Amino acid sequence: MKSSGSARATRRNAVSSSSAPAHAEPPARRAAKPARKLDGAAARPLAPTNAASAKPQGRTREDKDRPLFEDIRYLGRLLGDVVREQEGDAVFDVVETIRQTAVKFRREDDKAAAQTLEKMLRKLTPEQTVSVVRAFSYFSHLANIAEDRHHNRRRRIHALAGSAAQAGTVAYALDKLKQAGDASSKTIKQFFEGALIVPVLTAHPTEVQRKSILDAQHDIARLLAERDQPLTARELAHNEALLRARVTTLWQTRMLRDARLTVADEIENALSYYRATFLDELPALYADIEEALAEHGLRARVPAFFQMGSWIGGDRDGNPNVTAATLDEAISRQAAVIFEHYLEQVHKLGAELSVSNLLVGASDALKALAAASPDQSPHRVDEPYRRALIGVYTRLAASARVRLGEGTVPVRSAGRGAAPVRATPYADAEEFAADLRVLTDSLALHHGESLATPRLAPLMRAAEVFGFHLASIDLRQSSDIHEAVVAELLARGGVEADYAALPEADKLRVLLAALADPRPLRSPYLDYSDLAKSELGVLERAHAIRAQFGARAVRNYIISHTETVSDLVEVLLLQKETGLFEGTLGTPHANARNGLMVIPLFETIADLRNASDIMRAFFALPGVGELLAHQGHEQEVMLGYSDSNKDGGFLTSNWELYRAELALVDLFDERGIKLRLFHGRGGTVGRGGGPTYQAILSQPPGTVNGQIRLTEQGEVIASKFANPEIGRRNLETVVAATLEATLAPHSNAPKQLPAFEAAMQTLSDAAMASYRALVYETPGFTDYFFSSTPITEIAELNIGSRPASRKLQDPKNRKIEDLRAIPWGFSWGQCRLLLTGWYGFGSAVAAYLDGAPDAAERGKRVALLKKMNKTWPFFANLLSNMDMVLAKTDLAVASRYAQLVADKKLRKHVFERIVAEWHRTADALAEITGAHARLAANPLLARSIKNRFPYLDPLNHLQVELIKRHRAGDTNARLRRGIHLTINGIAAGLRNTG
């Protein structure tokens, strides 16, 4: 962070020499004409303007990345200026000294630097500490903006140069399939007709950024992008002034909310990404897909196969703050956002479509739509499109009013005529889309197709995708809660006194009898527990929401901790009691159907192993076949990555997920049922995170089949979707990977697959034994974990709407088993060990190779592992993700966290085991891949880490110091705030490691 305010500051680099090549001088960007150079501010042309120079010869990676280094330096200098201006020289100098000392500690594992750093941090006042934390946190955010800008810049340069389509795009997928002979027009058409892709946004306790911060960062990204265009000296100076103002705004804006987060905050946070990205970029993605298809000879309008989902407001698992009221608030706020978008777009269309029937004709349907409009203006008599749009606008406004209440959505004057509230509301979004189609068809018939492209076509696509609900809200609750409510209903109804105590077979007998009986269990004359009333209230509200906003608004019910068939049937019974289940189950001609699909979530290793058996038994129940028929012979199954990882470790979790998927595919194929997998992936590799493209392509053969749902966890939503261009790219990646995985499943089925799978099973068994030996069988490990990570502070600070577990507040009784998977993985990321993404692999490979009877057999086993990496996407993706995690670990920084463990013997024993396993894992990875340097195969990520981590390390050192003070009894509010800031800053710096 270099300030330009003094000679002393000029000698300091905004980015340490570890962060950028020595030749990357502070930017001197060219203006449009050779004017005076501004201090680091001249504009840079985006790309060569002629074809000859569009493909420069001999450019190195450093040449290509020079604009990125310049941007990072430039933003760092602006931030340095602001810190000096706002906080003074003393704070600025402290920030710089801490950075330099931390870099020395990182590079050289310098013990003297560590002692100097510790003394320096100990001397900081609470006020200084917060300022220093904010400085490094904001630099992480600014570096992320620069990286995103560079990704967009490189893609645009590729496009301008006419380069081949890049991996992860639909165009690339189509080219690849065509070359393999898998891309006939009929095949592609069938894929899109049967496809369903749904990213599902979830909340996360540490990554709910304030809208004020997001808005400022969005402006900074936009202004930074402007600097790639030729600018005059005056324009450049104006741009820098605006950038400086927005960085100052960031500095003077609270990073954190004052009050504890509520579900409402989480809802609003998610909605900000719809406004910033999804509302515009998802329709644009559809247009890109259709353009790519047209280039391959398939001119067709694809169905609305890509939709959005959400858990926010509907996920009750472990969060009693999610109720019928929050579900209602979630759908109401979602609907308000989409109605506002529709109304604004229709209003703008009214201004743009000034087409006169004196000059060009219109279809009869369009004329009828115009005639039905309340508009009476004599000035628009010959403008049927405008008149029709006024009618559409008034009906939309009325639709919002009847669903959300008067004044919820801003409504403009629709011109002369009837007030919007008097119009007939649309029955549903399909009716609204049908009116838009009338306009589109009429324009197409009368030489006006180009008029629909800019706004009308995206609006019609939005109506098809978002409906009146914006995103489908999933309901989720734990199976033990369902059992408690069902037991209460059965007991109060005099059916079964102690349902919970029954063996599984008897539970099913009781449940099926209740579902075959048209009479409800619930009585209006009986009182029920608060739990029962709350759970049933959520389902009743879901029933009302479906009637109000359409069946897509709430259509799935996820059952956490599914361990038995009765866990699924209980939710069918709860639907019956709340109007969501029609008919009677298992009786002839009863036309039984459930409104919400019951979706099991298999989470632990044991549950994954039992998944196919549970589903087989469920399908065999009387009447379930009829329910499946009403679902289009489709059934969704959710797989949990987080809990299986906490249970069995990284390698075993991935392997058992793979095996469970294959077993489910075999069962569903046997029964003629279409399987849709819902992947509960987190941000961390330990929670199933990592690059989405490779993750989907590495799925077992036959498991994607055109349909996939996957969670977009709250801790990575900002990095993936805050920038619209990056957001569209991430959305397209999911489509491209699903297309490839569906139509070329053989790419993940190499010839030696049986031998590969046998080796994986051996590795998995050894890895799980190693992992569990550390986590669950090492005496004192629980104390080590709670002392050496910020897990206690995360719990005490009550970050997020989900309350902290009371069990974790009692040191005598807390267990790893009681810890939720998200804070488990998150805490290991904060202390820079990221243990959940690699531990056990080194021991597993060592055991596998050492188990060979002789050197020749050992050589064969090494060769097999190398072949697995080269030809089996599943294994290659697993190693690639592990490589990324190992690159992000820092044993030197982690050793500082280990010092928080008071018991020296325990500290030494556990930390040395972790360090030894890290080296075993790194050695095993090197032997298999042949690469001894981290991320040798991923220079872009290696560069990213190199740029960012010198500014991340100080946040870790500060966090350790603040935790020490906090645990020593310091109750200063600024100290607690500082800890929270470091948590957010480290998460931002690690990006996909939340």
UniProtKB/Swiss-Prot annotation:
Give the compositionally biased regions (Low complexity). Answer: 14-25, 41-54
A matching Pfam family? PEPcase
**What is this enzyme's EC?**
4.1.1.31
Q: Which GO terms describe its biological process?
A: carbon fixation; oxaloacetate metabolic process; tricarboxylic acid cycle
* Record key words, sorted: Carbon dioxide fixation, Lyase, Magnesium
Q: Which PANTHER family match?
A: PHOSPHOENOLPYRUVATE CARBOXYLASE
Q: Which HAMAP family match?
A: PEPcase_type1
The task this protein performs is described as:
Forms oxaloacetate, a four-carbon dicarboxylic acid source for the tricarboxylic acid cycle.
Q: Tell me the protein's name.
A: Phosphoenolpyruvate carboxylase
Origin species: Burkholderia mallei (strain ATCC 23344)
Taxonomy of origin reads:
Bacteria, Pseudomonadati, Pseudomonadota, Betaproteobacteria, Burkholderiales
Task: Provide the gene name from the record.
Answer: ppc
